[in-house]
Amino acid sequence: MNYDRIYSNLVNSAEHPSKPRQTKAGYELHHIIPRSMGGSDDLDNLVFLTYKAHYTAHHLLAKIYGGKMYDAYWIMSNSKHRKVTSSQYAYAKAKKFENQRGAKRSDKTKKLMSIARSKVTLPDDFGKRISDGLTGRTLSTNHKEHIKNSSRNRFNTKTVIGYSPDGNTIELTGATEIRNAGFFHSAVYKCCKGIQSIHKGYTWKYKDEL
């Protein structure tokens, strides 16, 4: 299972905030590149995710990078504001203990892992990700850029055309240009995909599909 691709698709489908400290009912702000890995509070590194999607995002980050990402996943699993299954709770707790104590597991950790694995299907390369030394890993600048670019690449290479009811048109390329023009790029792309019919009075189409 390609967790990197799943994570990229998840953040790609989310909406970026239009201003610092913006809130949205029923959503939480998520750092595409976690702050613990050097991610910034820049708007292009932030997306709104539902509570469930936010939990899923941290689960994916934990599976991709291991180490301290399991600490964040455990915190979310242990929150009173989230409903998680007993197997999710056991798995998150076991991985946090494993991360704290290294490869040497206590009997308690082994028991938790056996409970979790009886209900959670792990990928074939899961053990390899841990053994490859991902624990406590710090991403290089190039790797950070790779993650950021992969999560935004689809948006940044698309040119869209907006049509107003009075016949005016506007041509914009990439999420930044769309935001600077006063539109929400996620809503614009939903219009282009046929998920949404109109955004701020405009209908939208991908230029390369006209």
UniProtKB/Swiss-Prot annotation:
Keywords: Endonuclease, Hydrolase, Nuclease
Keyword Nuclease: yes
Entry annotated with the keyword RNA-binding: no
Chain's gene name: mobC
Family statement drawn from the similarity comment of this UniProt entry: To phage T4 mobB and mobD.
HNH domain segment(s): 25-54
Coiled-coil region list: none
Pfam family for this entry, one: HNH
Superkingdom to which the source organism belongs: Viruses
Originating organism: Enterobacteria phage T4
GO MF: DNA binding; endonuclease activity; zinc ion binding
Protein name as annotated: Probable mobile endonuclease C
